[in-house]
């Protein structure tokens, strides 16, 4: 049996974190299934993020990725194979646009052709609302996808209205089993009430409400601190992003002198530093408008932390 798993392995977005979780799980059991010829194909919308992929993840990507054009071509041409494509449904079409994406090892391959050329293809999809966009429906139908794999019951219920769907949760590594490394922060967070948020900075994550609510409640409390770990959106300069954040922070009017109790972290942090922030926090807060699963929230729940989040979405499965 030949199986190729296509995903954004060498990025730092939510889809890449989920894909690496599945890849580690597959790696842990693959030796028990020698009949499976398993390979991966990795794509990215931002080649700059490759430098932020942890070395141990790169080693695992290298272990299963096609190392040469010849190896890839032979795999696709010699005998039938099945395909898993783990991404938003429109990514194969987006990658048809010249210079919009990067293929790992600079190999030459067409994502739509890889999917269509498979004996059976399975689409692994997380979505944030209770209805799929029309372009997603059209893409899934166009590839004659056998089954859509959903990481949450919320997603499965949504997808099952239109397509055959199977529920397979994302893989979460328990924070209590991971090493952590203390992080030098501009504020000493020891003995403080720490609110922690980890996510990409997009409108859907509703950071504006989080920042405003924290300031309204804790602006004059020196024993409370909000720690936000995020990344600068694409095509936005660091200077512009920080300026916008300060405007957001300063736009909240409060009746008394405010404390300097918000920490914004935008630089790359290794896994041990992230684990430290999870361990140090008292509350994980992500008031998102919609989540298909939310790996950061799941990791906080795994660590036994208090959670503040929206009452609907994929994350409700495990809260």
Features from the language model and the residues they span:
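Extended catalytic core of nucleotide-activated donor transferases of GT-like folds
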Residues: 4-6, 50-159
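Short alpha-helical donor nucleotide-sugar binding micro-motif in glycosyltransferases
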Residues: 275-281
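Short hydrophobic beta-strand element within catalytic cores of glycosyltransferases
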Residues: 306-309, 319
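Aromatic "clamp/platform" in nucleotide-sugar-dependent glycosyltransferases that forms part
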Residues: 289
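Donor nucleotide-sugar binding/catalytic pocket of nucleotide-sugar-dependent glycosyltransferases
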Residues: 146-180
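Conserved donor-binding/catalytic core segment of Leloir-type glycosyltransferases
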Residues: 4, 188-205, 211-214, 226-228
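Nucleotide-activated donor-binding/catalytic signature segment of Leloir-type glycosyltransferases, i.e.
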Residues: 236-272
């Amino acid at each position: 049996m030949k199986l190729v798993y296509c995903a954004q392995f060498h990025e730092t977005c939510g889809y890449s974190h989920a894909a690496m979780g599945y890849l580690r799980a597959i790696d842990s059991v693959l030796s028990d299934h020698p009949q499976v010829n398993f390979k991966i194909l990795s794509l990215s919308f931002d080649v700059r993020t490759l430098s932020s992929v942890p070395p141990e993840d790169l080693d695992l990507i290298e272990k299963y990725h096609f190392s040469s054009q010849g190896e890839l071509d032979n795999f696709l041409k010699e005998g039938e194979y099945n395909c898993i494509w783990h991404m938003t449904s429109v990514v194969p079409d987006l990658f048809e646009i010249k210079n919009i994406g990067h293929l790992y090892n600079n190999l030459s391959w067409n994502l739509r052709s890889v999917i269509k050329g498979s004996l059976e293809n399975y689409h692994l999809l997380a979505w944030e609302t209770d209805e799929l966009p029309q372009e997603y429906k059209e893409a899934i139908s166009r590839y004659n996808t056998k089954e859509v794999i959903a990481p949450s019951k919320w997603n499965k219920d949504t997808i099952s209205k239109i397509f055959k769907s199977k529920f397979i949760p994302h893989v979460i590594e328990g924070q209590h089993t991971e090493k952590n490394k203390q992080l030098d922060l501009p504020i000493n967070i020891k003995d403080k009430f720490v609110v922690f948020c980890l996510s990409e900075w997009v409108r859907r994550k509703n950071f504006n409400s989080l920042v405003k609510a924290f300031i309204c409640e804790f602006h004059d409390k020196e024993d409370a601190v909000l720690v936000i770990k995020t990344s600068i959106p694409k095509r936005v300069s660091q200077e512009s992003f920080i300026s916008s954040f300060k405007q957001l922070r300063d736009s909240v009017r409060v009746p008394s002198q405010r404390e300097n109790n918000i920490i914004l972290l935008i630089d790359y942090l290794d896994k041990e530093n992230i684990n430290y922030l999870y361990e140090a926090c008292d509350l994980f807060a992500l008031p998102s408008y919609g989540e298909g699963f939310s790996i950061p929230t799941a990791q906080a729940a795994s660590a036994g932390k208090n959670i503040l989040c929206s009452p609907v979405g994929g994350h409700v499965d495990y809260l």
